[in-house]
Every structure is written in structure tokens, then in C-alpha cells.
């Protein structure tokens, strides 16, 4: 049966929907209508395709990581090089698409949330390109962790608002951005950075990010004589790079799909972001999805060395894939991710983002159980420039025995 999700009400099975206050429903309905129209408009897609090619630098290579493959000694590993996009990650695919959509809707201002800063940088970049006012909401903890990206956003003309509520991380930035959207609904478009939030956001983000999987599928077919890979893999926080990789393969039942979530200091601690391992369904940021919550239903703090993965929920479509068994989600600790970070740097000369390092770490485990005539495509969602100082300080502290 051909996969067709979401349904007319924005649900993926029981997950998703539009759990927003009445004050936001108008904006959500307006966005849904505008998106349906844009999808049917060939000139909209043509403008986006032109930007992706000539501004972002797509298509990104599908690179055969031979040294990594030899080191692990299992499946042939291919890297989908989203780190080579303009701004250094997959986030630009969605940011450009949504700014084009905002322009089409006649909006003058752009707001967005960011964790690691990559979505903030991508949104600020797209807003600069289209001469739009831009405010980025970022948790105070992430502002400290990602000072370089904060400066980048400001350099691009965006205002960065440091959020001091709650645990001062990504979920708090989303709350602040949603509040700002309610206040400026007439002239403002909110660019959700991950496959989260009320419908139609998860679908919009999925569709704009699906360029990752579409390209990878075609590129692999070209080098393999028309075959499909045996598996595809990506790291997962909210889940946008993963859904972009997975969605074009969802009807290809022979292709296994793996997501690497962050288990931080370990599943036996409270310092993790492993929603599938430890969460249960609840409503967060306008959608029903698996979330990390305590016995009283209060949303818990997520933790990861990677600022882009410490979100206490996972997008509704991933929740549906998990429930029906279409994708497998495993958790990777900070230590394992750091090993992946070092390994790819040493073996392939590619410094990955800490987010992507979780996928590299899971690839080691999965590829080792596969045979050399099988293949695994890993989404290398971003480059590690933003994380080098943090990793340097971590390694120095460990060397001093702190």
C-alpha cells in the first residue's frame, strides 16, 4: 500500500494534529492554504530549485567513505554531504523554501527558533537574501554554547533574542517564538526549523528537506546500476534531516531506515534526549508526539552534548514510523558521538557536526552487522566548525582529568 500521510487533519496515525490556541489557528490555516497553493504552482518550485542549485550549491555529493568502510569492515558506507551546503548544514533547504513561502504570503517579518544555531543562520541567510526583517529566538544556554553562530546571525542582519525561561534551551526558544508569532500574526511568518509543531509544519519541513533523499536515491541508482541502498540513516532531534532522508524511501520496503537519537550521559541517567527510548505520547508545541515527561506529565529537560539534538520530543511522522515499525531508532551517548566525530575526521578528513556524529556512531554499529556487498547511506547533516571549540575544551578537560 502506498504511504499517504498526513491525513486531512494533519495526523500521522495518532500523532501530529493542530493543538494550538484559537489565536494561532488563523495563522496556521492561512499557512496551510498558502502552502497547498504553492505546491501546485510550478513557478514556485522552479524559483526554489534555482536557488537550491545556484545559491545553496545543490546537488550535494554522495560520497563513498572507503576508509571508514574498511575500518568498520561491513557494509559500504556512503555519506550524503549536506555539510557542503551553503551555511554548512541541511537547514538551508527548509529556510529558503519557507522564506519564499512567506514572501508569497506577503509577510514582511521572519521569526525562527534555533538550538545549535544552524537553523538560525540558515533563516538569517534567507531573510538577508530577500531583504526581510528577521528575529531569532535562542535559549540562553545555547547562546553561550554557540557564540560563533550568534555572531554569524547578527552579521547577517538578524536580531538574536536570548531566551531566559525554563531550562533556556531549544524547547524554550520554540515557546518564545510561538508567543512572538501570536503577537505579530498579520505581518510575520514563523519558520519552524524541524519537522515539528502544528500541521502543516511537519509536512512543509518534510517536503522541503526531501530533496536530500531524492538526490541520494538517484545518485545511488546511478552508481549501482539502478539499485536501492540496503539502509539509510540520520541523526534525530526533532527529525528534519532524518525525515528528508527517509521520506523518498518510505515505500521501498527493502530499504531499512535508522535514526540515531541522543542518549547524552546514558539512558540510566536523566541527562539524555532519548525520546523514543524513554518518552511517551504527549502534546508539545502544537502537536501530539512522543515527548520526555515526568510522572505528572511535565515536560522534562533534554540533554545532549549536541545543541541541535537536545529537544524533548520527536516529530510526529517519526513517531508514526516508530509505531508501525517502518524505521528503527537507536540511542547514542555523548562519548560514542565524540568517537564518531574523531573517527570521521581522522579517516576521511571530514569534520562532522556533533549532531551528525551521532549518525556516524550508529553507522559503526549497524554497518558492522551488514555484509560488504550491502550499502548504507548516512546523512551527514552538517559540518563541525561550530563544534570544534566545544570539543577542544572537552578533550582538554578530560586530559587534565577533570
Curated annotation (Swiss-Prot):
The enzyme's E.C. designation: 4.2.1.20
Oligomeric and partner information: Tetramer of two alpha and two beta chains.
Catalysed conversion reaction: (1S,2R)-1-C-(indol-3-yl)glycerol 3-phosphate + L-serine = D-glyceraldehyde 3-phosphate + L-tryptophan + H2O
Pfam families: PALP (PF00291)
GO molecular function per UniProt: tryptophan synthase activity
Pathway recorded for this protein: Amino-acid biosynthesis; L-tryptophan biosynthesis; L-tryptophan from chorismate: step 5/5
Top enzyme category: lyase
GO cellular component: cytoplasm
Highest taxon of source: Bacteria
Keywords, alphabetical: Amino-acid biosynthesis, Aromatic amino acid biosynthesis, Lyase, Pyridoxal phosphate, Tryptophan biosynthesis
Protein name (Swiss-Prot/TrEMBL): Tryptophan synthase beta chain
Protein function: The beta subunit is responsible for the synthesis of L-tryptophan from indole and L-serine.
Tagged with keyword Lyase: yes
Required co-factors: pyridoxal 5'-phosphate
Source species: Streptococcus thermophilus (strain CNRZ 1066)
Modified residues (N6-(pyridoxal phosphate)lysine): 91
Entry-linked NCBIfam families: trpB (TIGR00263)
Family, as annotated: Belongs to the TrpB family.
Amino acid at each position: 500500500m502506498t504511504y499517504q500521510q498526513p491525513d486531512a487533519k494533519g495526523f500521522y496515525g495518532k500523532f501530529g494534529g493542530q493543538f494550538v490556541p484559537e489565536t494561532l489557528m488563523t495563522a496556521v490555516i492561512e499557512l496551510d492554504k498558502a502552502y497547498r497553493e504553492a505546491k501546485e504552482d510550478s513557478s514556485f518550485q522552479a524559483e526554489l530549485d534555482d536557488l537550491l542549485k545556484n545559491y545553496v550549491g545543490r546537488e550535494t555529493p554522495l560520497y563513498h567513505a572507503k576508509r571508514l568502510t574498511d575500518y568498520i569492515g561491513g557494509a559500504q558506507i556512503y555519506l550524503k554531504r549536506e555539510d557542503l551546503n551553503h551555511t554548512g548544514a541541511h537547514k538551508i533547504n527548509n529556510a529558503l523554501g519557507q522564506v519564499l513561502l512567506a514572501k508569497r504570503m506577503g509577510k514582511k517579518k521572519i521569526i525562527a527558533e534555533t538550538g545549535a544555531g544552524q537553523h538560525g543562520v540558515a533563516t538569517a541567510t534567507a531573510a538577508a537574501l530577500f531583504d526581510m526583517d528577521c528575529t531569532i529566538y535562542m535559549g540562553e544556554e545555547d547562546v553561550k554554547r554557540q557564540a560563533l553562530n550568534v555572531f554569524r546571525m547578527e552579521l547577517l542582519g538578524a536580531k538574536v533574542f536570548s531566551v531566559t525561561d525554563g531550562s533556556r534551551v531549544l524547547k524554550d526558544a520554540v515557546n518564545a517564538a510561538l508567543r512572538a508569532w501570536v503577537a505579530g500574526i498579520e505581518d510575520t511568518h514563523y519558520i519552524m526549523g524541524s519537522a515539528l509543531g502544528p500541521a502543516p509544519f511537519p509536512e512543509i519541513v518534510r517536503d522541503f528537506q526531501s530533496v536530500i533523499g531524492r538526490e541520494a536515491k538517484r545518485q545511488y541508482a546511478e552508481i549501482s546500476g539502478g539499485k536501492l541502498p540496503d539502509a539509510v540513516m540520520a541523526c534525530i532531534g526533532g527529525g528534519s534531516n532524518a525525515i528528508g532522508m527517509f521520506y523518498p524511501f518510505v515505500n521501498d520496503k527493502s530499504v531499512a531506515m535508522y535514526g540515531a537519537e541522543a542518549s547524552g550521559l546514558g539512558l540510566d541517567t536523566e541527562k539524555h534526549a532519548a525520546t523514543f527510548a524513554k518518552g511517551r505520547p504527549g502534546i508539545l508545541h502544537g502537536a501530539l508526539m512522543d515527548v520526555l515527561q515526568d510522572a505528572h506529565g511535565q515536560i522534562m529537560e533534554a540533554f545532549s552534548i549536541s545543541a541541535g539534538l537536545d529537544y524533548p520530543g520527536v516529530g510526529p511522522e517519526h513517531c508514526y514510523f516508530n509505531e508501525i515499525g517502518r524505521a528503527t531508532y537507536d540511542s547514542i551517548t555523548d562519548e560514542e558521538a565524540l568517537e564518531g566525530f574523531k573517527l570521521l575526521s581522522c579517516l576521511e578528513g571530514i569534520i562532522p557536526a556533533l549532531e551528525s556524529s551521532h549518525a556516524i556512531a550508529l553507522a559503526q554499529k549497524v554497518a558492522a552487522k551488514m555484509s560488504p556487498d550491502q550499502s548504507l547511506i548516512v546523512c551527514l547533516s552538517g559540518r563541525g566548525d561550530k563544534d570544534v571549540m566545544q570539543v577542544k575544551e572537552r578533550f582538554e578537560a578530560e586530559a587534565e582529568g577533570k
